[in-house]
Amino acid sequence: MPAYRSRTTTHGRNMAGARGLWRATGVKNSDFGKPIIAIVNSFTQFVPGHVHLKDLGQMVAREVEAAGGIAKEFNTIAVDDGIAMGHDGMLYSLPSRELIADSVEYMVNAHCADAMVCISNCDKITPGMLMAAMRLNIPAIFVSGGPMEAGKVTLGDGRKVSLDLVDAMVAAADDKISDADLAAIEEAACPTCGSCSGMFTANSMNCLSEALGLSLPGNGSTLATHAFRKNLFLEAGRRIVEVTRRHYEQDDASVLPRAIASKAAFLNAMSLDIAMGGSTNTVLHLLAIAQEGGVDFTMDDIDALSRKVPCLCKVAPNTANVHMEDVHRAGGIMAILGELDRAGLIDRDCPTVHAPTIGAAIDQWDIARSNDPQARELFLAAPGGVPTQVAFSQATLWPDLDLDREHGVIRSAKAPFSKDGGLAVLKGNVALDGCIVKTAGVDESILVFSGRAKVYESQDAAVSGILTGKVEAGDVVVIRYEGPKGGPGMQEMLYPTSYLKSKGLGKACALITDGRFSGGTSGLSIGHVSPEAAAGGTIGLVRDGDRIEIDIPNRSIRLAVPEDELAARRAEQDAKGWKPAQPRQRQVSAALKVYAQFAASADKGAVRILPE
């Protein structure tokens, strides 16, 4: 029987001082011996996805206490990728994931907490906390802040459209859009608290937490503003005490993160990711989370799944006017998992924090097969249409559910958006260890593409080239030395891809990089090229005018340069050192240098690898 970790600090004569300090936080004599549950919050006023979380940690704490536990809250940092985008602030985004994981470990281990409820939401916070959960392997339940409502605007020509943050970015660089329309788009794009409303990285990761079995049904899609989301927080507080007691008092290891998020659960999550056309960043994060838990989940697994899992759901940025609120109306993540289950693409036996197996959860919560009144009510939660930063502030309901699996937001495997899934792994001489493309966002006309390289040594240089007309139809924009080591920090490339769209080149150009992309990216955008340029990858040998051949159906990417020429270039580059040809005006802090020193390549999740 495992001993409660917290008794290290609450029991024994030698812990009199520690008990005195616990009492100073509000713990009473009668509380000693109860499980101590860490409420791992991430409230900040910098991030719309987290601005409403301030009081939610204490809401969970009260439920923990009512269920017989001691609740103690702390906060992690949270970087807003949208605000950090397009300048050197983006260098800090991915490294913040490791800092979040470390800070959770530090707090939980320093104070010997028995379990935790993780309140996350945006891009690096959910994966950072998931990494910590796998690392610590104590009972954990995730509940995120929820998606933002989509913006609604009427343009000058009378068109009414749903939109999001990325629409504002694209519109800003489109000379055809009037100042008045741009102002209207900007003001309407982000109307409420919550994670940005498309299937971007934040929402993708919160959806995947459902498939991993570590969060409750509806976590990925119930709007931040809706009253129904409150139930997820209350249930998390109650349930964490139950599963904690099962582990420590009944010796039940099946409730631990590593037992729940097994290899099979990661395959389920990746199948969901491919089916819903999630952000390419999810690949990076799932690899990192798996590594923390010692799970043998690799790019080869992702490649194999991408060849058999169809695309069953298309959401912004992969299609216009469809956002997370629409996915929710169609049954949310449990509905997509249900369609994958019907196609034999889900392992039903994986346990979860809320049901004995994911199969049992699907049977209850998939509205296409279940008449469970709780499920059918949950997925009627609709946007309120009122700008707000207050959680649970509206209770609007859809008039009906979207159960159309032939033409609706969620499709069956018999009527998919495409037989090929929404993500693919490409390999070839320019990416020997692989790279990632979000096929759900690629137009069918350019699934096979060949073009001349236009090489840039930084994201800033590429943006300048695109905006000044130096990039033309038929070009393959190459942005290098932006990987985990080379950036450092592996910046997102949302501005270059958005500007290609605004210049009318979204279907006429490709972009490849050893950096990564925002979840808001679409188009022929190929990221995570591994090995990266700074690690001696072939992408560092590409020269202007070289032909690059991309064949997504055959999963290949090739630099059409003879091997002897590449060998000569490599010898020349070895002599010079693997660094940008033109010096960059970039201030790299000591903190970023530490990350770069230990960062692995993208195919390993860009985690830190310590020397043995």
Swiss-Prot record:
It comes from Paracoccus denitrificans (strain Pd 1222). The modification N6-carboxylysine is found at K124. Pfam families: ILV_EDD_C, ILVD_EDD_N. Functions in the biosynthesis of branched-chain amino acids. Catalyzes the dehydration of (2R,3R)-2,3-dihydroxy-3-methylpentanoate (2,3-dihydroxy-3-methylvalerate) into 2-oxo-3-methylpentanoate (2-oxo-3-methylvalerate) and of (2R)-2,3-dihydroxy-3-methylbutanoate (2,3-dihydroxyisovalerate) into 2-oxo-3-methylbutanoate (2-oxoisovalerate), the penultimate precursor to L-isoleucine and L-valine, respectively. Its cofactor is [2Fe-2S] cluster; Mg(2+). It comes from the Bacteria. It catalyses: (2R)-2,3-dihydroxy-3-methylbutanoate = 3-methyl-2-oxobutanoate + H2O; (2R,3R)-2,3-dihydroxy-3-methylpentanoate = (S)-3-methyl-2-oxopentanoate + H2O. This is Dihydroxy-acid dehydratase.
